[in-house]
């Protein structure tokens, strides 16, 4: 019995035990008040008044001491001893009170029932057996001294039967309650596990998910949606506060649910998304489930297919142009070697050669664009990669040009094809050094790596102190064949943008207030699938 414990939970067991103490204290107090009042002779027909008085006081004092000094325990032995003592003391009061007419037998039935909530199986039935035997034996002893007690055997037997019935019924009810609670706990655990799994799946989804109530307050947002909204936490906030365009789109959908929502940008500088709405009817409140599908990857795949077809066409055209262009350049070179040419004619042949070289460079860039291989993104530690890039770059620096590196705090990683990143960065650095040298005679470029404070995405800025780009030409900066130099091909920045997009990165340009230009590359999240 020492090794056995209560099957109830600790909280339930302690609560029932406290109620048991309170019940016994109440009974003891009522008995003491009854024997101390004038109602004793009217209510009780005591056979042994002095024994009943002493027993009532002992019962009250015993229960007070138990309530004050018995430590809470889940061991069965202390509870068994307490219940058995309680039954024996009530049996003594039953005898002193004159047996069945005293009404103490009913208190025994209640005591047995409460004890069997805490004690289960044969241990609980021992308490019922003790009470039943006590009732029968004490009724027998009373019949020896009081002839009227001989008529109480049936009632005493009935009370004993009630003790066993109460024990068995209570144990069955408690057992069923335990099974119900166990099943409820198992189901609650299953539901909790499913909720955790659903939350994990929801957070790992690349599709942004928002749940909005009828007041347009955001109830739930997964990590992808937070990234699209450029926020850390939007729960409880108004949808219109963070994305007025999405709010307007949802209102239009409420008016006409069959309308296909147009693509939009959730935030001004964010990617283009395709929203879709599903109504979640919840009685009087109507919730809306919003899916935000980033279509930049779909557009990127379509762009790659378009470029693949265009690349094959341009490669054929470039190849056809290259042969006659080579003949023109060769003829101009032979003509320039003639001794009969005067100075103006030599100048013309030089122009032919210079423009032929420029045209050949355009053809080379077009062929390079058409032969561009599929991106193979890798997990990159940008700090380590940039440090290696800067260490290896001095061999390509001219005169006293300088390349500076500024690294932000913490671990900064992304997924990108390292060869294509090298190609993009080399092009941007060369442009920056060239324009910086034109403005100051010495080229300087700064590479600054950090995390965007809003999106937490890795950001690399290529900064120069050159003249910058005229405001009226900013919109055309990344278009093919757009150039601000007579010797440029206009394909470098276009190719850089295409390489960034094929790696799910974004490149932007802005003029700095203090002068110069800044190309900003926003990389993809390191856990984003390619």
UniProtKB/Swiss-Prot annotation:
Recorded GO MF terms: ATP binding; phosphorelay sensor kinase activity
SUPFAM superfamilies, alphabetized: ATPase domain of HSP90 chaperone/DNA topoisomerase II/histidine kinase (SSF55874), Homodimeric domain of signal transducing histidine kinase (SSF47384)
GO cellular component term of the entry, any: plasma membrane
Topological domain ranges for the Cytoplasmic compartment: 175-530
Enzyme Commission number(s) from the entry: 2.7.13.3
Cell compartments where the protein resides: Cell inner membrane
Domain PAS: 196-260
A GO biological process held by the record: regulation of cell projection assembly
Free-text disruption phenotype from the record: Deletion mutant results in changes in swimming, swarming and/or twitching motility associated with virulence in specific hosts.
Domain notes from UniProt: The linker domain is the critical region for polar localization.
Record-given protein name: Sensor protein kinase PilS
């Amino acid at each position: 019995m020492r090794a056995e414990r209560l099957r109830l939970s600790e909280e339930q067991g302690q609560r029932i035990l406290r109620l048991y103490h309170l019940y016994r204290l109440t009974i003891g107090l009522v008995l003491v008040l009854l024997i101390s009042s004038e109602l004793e002779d009217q209510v009780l027909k005591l056979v042994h008044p002095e024994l009943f008085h002493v027993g009532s006081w002992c019962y009250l004092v015993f229960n007070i001491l138990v309530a004050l000094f018995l430590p809470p325990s889940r061991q069965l032995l202390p509870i068994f001893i307490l219940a058995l003592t309680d039954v024996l003391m009530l049996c003594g009061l039953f005898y002193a009170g004159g047996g069945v007419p005293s009404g103490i037998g009913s208190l025994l039935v209640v005591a047995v029932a409460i004890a069997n909530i805490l004690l289960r199986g044969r241990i609980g039935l021992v308490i019922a057996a003790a009470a039943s035997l006590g009732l029968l034996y004490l009724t027998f002893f009373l019949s020896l001294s009081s002839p009227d007690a001989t008529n109480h055997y049936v009632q005493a037997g009935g009370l004993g039967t009630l003790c066993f019935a109460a024990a068995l019924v209570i144990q069955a009810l408690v057992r069923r309650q335990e099974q119900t609670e166990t099943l409820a706990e198992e189901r609650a655990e299953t539901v909790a596990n499913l909720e955790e799994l659903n939350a994990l799946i929801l957070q790992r989804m690349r599709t942004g998910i928002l749940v909005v109530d009828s007041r347009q307050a955001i109830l739930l947002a997964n990590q992808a949606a937070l990234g699209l909204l450029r926020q850390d936490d939007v729960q409880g906030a108004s949808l219109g506060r963070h994305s007025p365009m999405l709010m307007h789109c949802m209102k239009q959908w409420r008016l006409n649910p069959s309308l296909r929502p147009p693509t939009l940008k959730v935030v001004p500088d964010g990617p283009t998304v395709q929203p879709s709405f599903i109504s979640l009817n919840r009685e009087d409140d109507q919730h809306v489930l919003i899916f935000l599908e980033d279509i930049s990857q779909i557009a990127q795949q379509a762009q790659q297919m378009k470029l693949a077809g265009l690349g094959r066409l341009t490669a054929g055209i470039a190849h056809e142009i290259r042969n006659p262009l080579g003949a023109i350049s060769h003829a101009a070179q032979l003509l320039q070697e003639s001794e009969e040419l005067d100075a103006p004619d030599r100048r013309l042949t030089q122009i032919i050669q210079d423009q032929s070289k420029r045209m050949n460079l355009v053809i080379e860039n077009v062929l390079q664009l058409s032969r561009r291989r599929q991106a193979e993104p890798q997990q990159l530690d940008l700090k380590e990669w940039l440090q290696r890039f800067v260490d290896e770059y001095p061999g390509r620096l001219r005169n006293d040009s300088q390349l500076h590196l500024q690294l932000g705090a913490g671990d900064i990683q992304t997924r990108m094809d390292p060869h294509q990143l090298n190609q993009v960065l080399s092009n941007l650095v060369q442009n920056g050094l060239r324009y910086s040298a034109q403005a100051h005679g010495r080229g300087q470029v700064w590479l600054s790596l950090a995390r965007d404070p809003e999106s937490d995405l890795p950001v690399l800025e290529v900064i120069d102190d050159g003249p910058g780009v005229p405001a009226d030409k900013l919109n055309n900066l990344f278009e093919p064949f757009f150039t601000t130099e007579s010797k440029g091909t206009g394909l470098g920045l276009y190719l850089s943008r295409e390489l960034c997009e094929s790696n799910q990165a974004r490149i932007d340009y802005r003029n700095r207030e203090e002068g110069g230009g800044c190309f900003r590359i926003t990389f993809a999240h390191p856990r984003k699938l390619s």
